[in-house]
């Protein structure tokens, strides 16, 4: 018996020594927990609007570090009750919790409960990999012990609550409080604190934005555990458990937006490591009020367009498409010509195979990009045929005329659905919106707005096609001689092409470069906007017109300050006169006529002094309106993400202009209703539109702007006298 005991004791000692031999090198090679004393996790940088209001945040991780003193006791207690009930008493690992978890998991036949402490979670997340091996678990336990020997419990809790991922892009309790509730962590109520503590186990599964019922059940479980641990009274429990979820639903898709993406790209490309570290204060030119109006105007305008073209709705997220698809499950049959939501099955060359609840269909892709999407709109064509409907999209850019500051920019109808920023990346044909460049070129050659141009149809050689091309007018009418003013106001295509031929490519391309359109090609179809531009480029070009020949380069970053208060950069307007004021003032008057008597007449409802130009491309693929007051210039584009017709008569006037009006009717009220500056070299005279002479008391007249010396001097009376002599 004695030998047996000695033998067993020897085995135990040998195992213990072997364990020490195995553990000591691992323990010695563990990271030094003192590194946490200087731990500076990536934090968010704050982006402010032009008035100093917080617009949003950017960064690798959305985190705002807060000291333990700012975190309420009920928030701390919620996490302790849920994640580590013995946190205040264990030494880094909790043997009781490990045994309890082992028993529960054994009985369940699967892992349903963990035994890791908060300190172990901290060790794993900050120092170790996520591989599931015995060695990693041992390292985690040993490192947790080391951390407990280095820091007090309050510091460990502070590190944990600032490090933990809580879903929706939020790291730490302060960021999560802002994302889910729109408030600081020290402002959270008991039920709100419990919801945050419900998230570490599975942030996606219990995300209250997407799974409110699960989140509510999990929150109530946290409250129950707080009651069991004595952190709250039965009365507090009853009050909190009966409260509904109160998350800030508008933050569901606010992880970023098109403008924040622009800021992030700019800062990270320019500052690299400094940007990754975060904690910058970035002051921008954007006005939050303008931006909200822009987003609403674009969204409402696209809804109107969607209704016209037959789209059942415009999704804000992929979730919207999924819900619509599920609702279609009750359909008994598909109606030919109707648009449905279909599930994408696979791509087959230039075709896409889709399904609508058992009905498999096939449609041509035509350049459609559905990356990241599982569902798509389709028009049922009968049999197994479908027309794949691309995303209806739009963008809006608004720039301060006098400074070049971008005041609002929206790159699409929903950032959550598509992150592609059409305002700065989408290359689209501007259609007739390019025409002011040609008309200004004619004025620089000595013509006036009442000079006439032959507007008859003529064939022109198109080098891109290698054949003759005859321009057509939107209204399919034929015209004779018309004034430049009338031709621009009514967007007569044949007049624009003939004028381009008369003025010559060299001057037109030169003027294009001066307004920032440096990719114009010497083709006659240029007069109809066959070049590709971004909405930002085209809007910036109109800024030069609105500012009477002075270009102010568009910019959106005013100042960047680092965490120490050092100014990294500060930007001011860069303005330069690129075109003569007198000649540029004349096309501004002509663009005013577009609003007063031409294709943009509906903009006159603004009762403000504005000017602008519609644009519609071939087959109604792109719809534009770019217009301005003396203070603000705004461009709107509407179209599909691929080159596809919006439908017959879906012109810039019908599609884009209403969005522009909705935005400008609010924004222009923030400025004086003043006319455009009249340089001393210009003169305003009343012109009789019938005879193109000076109006006097014998005839009606329309006020028009001329460069002094180019205005007519014959009056209606003079003309009548001359005709009488004949």
UniProtKB/Swiss-Prot annotation:
GO MF, one annotated term: serine-type D-Ala-D-Ala carboxypeptidase activity
Region spans: Transpeptidase: 379-662
Disulfide bridges in this chain: none
One BP annotation, GO: cell wall organization
Catalysed conversion reaction: [GlcNAc-(1->4)-Mur2Ac(oyl-L-Ala-gamma-D-Glu-L-Lys-D-Ala-D-Ala)](n)-di-trans,octa-cis-undecaprenyl diphosphate + beta-D-GlcNAc-(1->4)-Mur2Ac(oyl-L-Ala-gamma-D-Glu-L-Lys-D-Ala-D-Ala)-di-trans,octa-cis-undecaprenyl diphosphate = [GlcNAc-(1->4)-Mur2Ac(oyl-L-Ala-gamma-D-Glu-L-Lys-D-Ala-D-Ala)](n+1)-di-trans,octa-cis-undecaprenyl diphosphate + di-trans,octa-cis-undecaprenyl diphosphate + H(+); Preferential cleavage: (Ac)2-L-Lys-D-Ala-|-D-Ala. Also transpeptidation of peptidyl-alanyl moieties that are N-acyl substituents of D-alanine
Transglycosylase: annotated segments: 45-213
Compartments in which it is found: Cell inner membrane
Active-site annotation: 83 (proton donor), 432 (acyl-ester intermediate)
Documented EC number(s): 2.4.99.28, 3.4.16.4
Coiled coil: none
Pfam families per the UniProt record, alphabetical: Transgly, Transpeptidase
Matches recorded under InterPro entries: Beta-lactam/transpept-like, Glyco_trans_51, Glycosyltr_51/Transpeptidase, Lysozyme-like_dom_sf, PBP_transglycosylase, PCN-bd_Tpept
Keyword Transcription regulation appears in the UniProt entry: no
Cytoplasmic topology ranges: 1-3
Protein name according to UniProt: Penicillin-binding protein 1A
Species in which this protein is naturally found: Aquifex aeolicus (strain VF5)
């Amino acid at each position: 018996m004695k030998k047996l005991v000695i033998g067993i004791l020897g085995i135990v000692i040998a195992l213990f020594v072997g364990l020490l031999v195995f553990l000591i090198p691992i323990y010695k090679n563990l990271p030094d927990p003192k590194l946490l004393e200087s731990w500076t996790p990536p934090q968010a940088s704050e982006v402010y609007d032009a008035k100093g209001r917080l617009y949003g945040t950017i960064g690798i991780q959305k985190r705002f570090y807060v000291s333990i003193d700012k975190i309420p006791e009920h928030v701390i207690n919620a996490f302790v009750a849920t994640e580590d009930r013995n946190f205040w008493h264990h030494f880094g690992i909790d043997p009781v919790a490990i045994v309890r978890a082992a028993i529960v998991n054994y009985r369940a036949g699967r892992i349903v409960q963990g035994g890791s402490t908060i300190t172990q979670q901290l060790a794993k997340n900050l120092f170790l990999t996520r591989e599931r091996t015995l060695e990693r678990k041992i390292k985690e336990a040993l490192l947790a012990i080391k951390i407990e020997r280095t820091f007090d419990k309050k510091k460990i809790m502070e590190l944990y609550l600032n490090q933990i991922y809580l879903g929706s892009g939020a790291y730490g309790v302060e960021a999560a409080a802002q994302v889910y509730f729109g408030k600081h962590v020290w402002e959270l109520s008991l039920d709100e604190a419990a919801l945050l503590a419900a998230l570490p186990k599975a942030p996606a599964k219990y995300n209250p934005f997407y799974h409110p019922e699960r989140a509510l059940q999990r929150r109530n479980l946290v409250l129950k555990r707080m009651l069991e641990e004595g952190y709250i009274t039965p009365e507090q429990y009853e009050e909190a458990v009966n409260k509904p979820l109160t998350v800030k639903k508008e933050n569901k898709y606010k992880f970023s937006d098109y403008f924040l993406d622009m800021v992030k790209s700019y800062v990270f490309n320019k500052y690299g490591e400094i940007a990754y570290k975060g904690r910058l204060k970035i002051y921008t030119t954007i006005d939050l009020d303008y931006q909200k109006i822009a987003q609403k105007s674009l969204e409402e305008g696209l809804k109107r367009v969607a209704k016209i073209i037959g789209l059942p709705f415009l999704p804000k997220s992929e979730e919207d498409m999924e819900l619509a698809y599920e609702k279609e499950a009750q359909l008994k049959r598909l109606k030919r010509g109707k648009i449905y939501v279909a599930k994408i099955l696979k791509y087959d060359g230039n075709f896409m195979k889709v399904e609508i609840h058992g009905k498999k269909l096939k449609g041509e892709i035509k350049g459609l990009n559905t990356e990241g999407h599982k569902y798509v709109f389709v028009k049922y064509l009968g049999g197994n045929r479908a027309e794949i409907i691309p995303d209806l999209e739009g963008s809006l850019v608004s720039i301060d005329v006098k400074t070049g500051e971008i005041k609002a920019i929206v790159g699409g109808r929903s950032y959550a659905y598509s992150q592609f920023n059409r305002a700065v990346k989408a290359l689209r044909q501007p259609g007739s919106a390019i025409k002011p460049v040609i008309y200004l070129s004619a004025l620089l050659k000595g013509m006036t707005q009442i000079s006439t141009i032959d507007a008859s149809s003529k064939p022109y050689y198109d080098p891109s096609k290698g054949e003759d091309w005859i321009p057509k007018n939107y209204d399919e009418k034929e015209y004779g001689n018309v004034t430049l003013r009338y031709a621009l106001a009514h967007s007569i295509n044949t007049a624009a092409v003939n004028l381009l031929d008369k003025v010559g490519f060299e001057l037109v391309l030169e003027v294009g470069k001066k307004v920032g359109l440096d990719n114009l090609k010497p083709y006659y179809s240029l007069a109809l906007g066959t070049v590709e531009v971004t909405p930002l480029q085209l809007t910036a070009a109109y800024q030069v017109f609105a500012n009477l020949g002075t270009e102010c380069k568009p910019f959106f970053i005013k100042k960047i300050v680092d965490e120490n208060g050092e100014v990294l950069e500060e930007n001011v307007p860069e303005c330069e006169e690129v075109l003569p004021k007198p000649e540029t003032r004349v096309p501004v008057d002509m663009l005013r006529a577009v609003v007063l008597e031409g294709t943009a007449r509906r903009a006159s409802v603004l009762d403000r002094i504005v000017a602008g130009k519609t644009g519609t491309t071939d087959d109604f693929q792109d719809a534009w309106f770019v217009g301005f007051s003396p203070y603000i210039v705004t461009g709107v584009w509407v179209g599909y993400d691929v080159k596809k017709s919006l439908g017959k008569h879906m012109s810039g006037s019908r599609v884009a202009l209403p969005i522009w009006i909705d935005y400008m009717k609010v924004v222009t009220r923030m400025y004086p209703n003043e006319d455009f500056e009249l340089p001393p070299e210009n003169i305003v005279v009343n012109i009789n539109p019938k005879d193109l002479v000076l109006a006097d008391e014998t005839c009606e007249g329309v006020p028009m702007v001329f460069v002094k010396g180019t205005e007519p001097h014959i009056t209606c009376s003079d003309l009548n006298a001359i005709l009488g002599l004949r």
